[in-house]
């Protein structure tokens, strides 16, 4: 197969591994810098050009679209879909999962366990917003943040009010979430491919920190997940419409709670921790499923 990898940086671990895994299995791999591709939106023959040439003959495309380039990245991916190229994750699913509020609303509608969450722009009653999610301690998040940025733990009501006011002063929409004390600063990253969790790891925040992101100095270790956690992760990915996803779960006193569904999960942490060939499993998934025009939207974007 001829497989495109949409990635801004061919030297990133995840991009390198996907290219290696594809080549080892006999596929032709090409990394395309998402922002440098440009498109012809003509109705009779949609095209993508890159480095002065039309991209042709691709069977599948693997989007590794960073949060900052979501809008243009999804447009390029949608153009591939219009050309009948099979996407590992569809553009509509990626944009859905990048909008944290929309993602939580969809998960909530399907009855998937979530922390109690409030959402606000400039509420006229901040104490009521805080009480609505069960009071302090609570977690306050800016909607656009990634890798643990824009996330604050407010341990007292006073602190929560100050943080919320500060964010509103910056004209930010925010999410206010109950703090799951019993998780002890740890979460579980479940790596879903198709309808299976193929690998999972526990991420533990470093001492004095509550964000377990590996970018924040958290540490990763092996963990055995329960059938309920496995089912929750697979269902969450399915609700978002993602074939490949990193689903972050907290262990709470009332079962697994989904924190986030990531449409472009990093491979380094999960492969290093588990020793599994996750990149190879992603390529195998494409081998089984890639057919021209086989998006849920039938290539209509």
From Swiss-Prot:
Q: Report a single Gene Ontology molecular function.
A: ribosomal S6-glutamic acid ligase activity
Pfam families with a match to the protein in the record:
RimK (PF08443), Rimk_N (PF18030)
Does the keyword field hold Magnesium? yes
Q: Where does Mg(2+) 1 bind?
A: 248, 260
Cofactors (names):
Mg(2+); Mn(2+)
State whether keyword Heme applies. no
Matching entries from NCBIfam families are given as:
PRK10446.1, rimK_fam
> What is the name of this protein?
Probable alpha-L-glutamate ligase
To which species is this protein native? Ectopseudomonas mendocina (strain ymp)
């Amino acid at each position: 197969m001829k497989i495109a990898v949409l990635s801004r940086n061919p030297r990133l671990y995840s991009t390198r591994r996907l290219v290696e895994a594809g080549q080892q299995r006999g596929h032709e791999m090409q990394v395309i810098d998402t922002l440098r591709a440009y498109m012809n939106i003509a109705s009779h023959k949609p095209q993508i050009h890159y480095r002065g040439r039309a991209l042709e003959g691709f069977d599948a495309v693997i989007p590794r679209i960073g949060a900052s380039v979501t809008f243009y990245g999804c447009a390029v991916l949608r153009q591939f879909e219009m050309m009948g190229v099979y996407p590992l994750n569809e553009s509509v699913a990626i944009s859905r999962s990048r909008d944290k509020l929309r993602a939580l609303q969809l998960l909530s509608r399907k009855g998937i366990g979530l922390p109690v969450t409030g959402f606000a722009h400039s509420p006229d009653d901040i104490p009521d917003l805080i009480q609505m999610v069960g009071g302090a301690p609570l977690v306050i998040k800016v909607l656009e943040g990634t890798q643990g940025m824009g996330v604050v733990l407010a341990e007292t009501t006073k602190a929560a009010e100050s943080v919320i006011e500060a964010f509103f002063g910056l004209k930010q929409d925010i999410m206010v979430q109950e703090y799951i004390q019993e998780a002890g600063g740890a979460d579980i990253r479940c790596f879903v491919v198709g309808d299976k969790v193929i690998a999972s790891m526990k991420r533990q925040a470093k001492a004095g920190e509550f964000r377990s992101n590996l970018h924040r100095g958290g540490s990763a270790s092996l963990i055995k997940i329960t059938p309920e956690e496995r089912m929750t992760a697979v269902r969450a990915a399915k609700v978002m419409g993602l074939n490949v996803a990193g689903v972050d779960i907290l262990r709470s006193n009332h079962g697994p709670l989904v924190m986030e569904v990531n449409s472009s999960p990093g491979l380094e942490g999960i492969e290093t921790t588990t020793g599994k060939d996750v990149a190879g499993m992603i390529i195998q998934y494409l081998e089984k499923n890639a057919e021209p025009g086989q998006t849920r939207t039938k290539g209509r974007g």
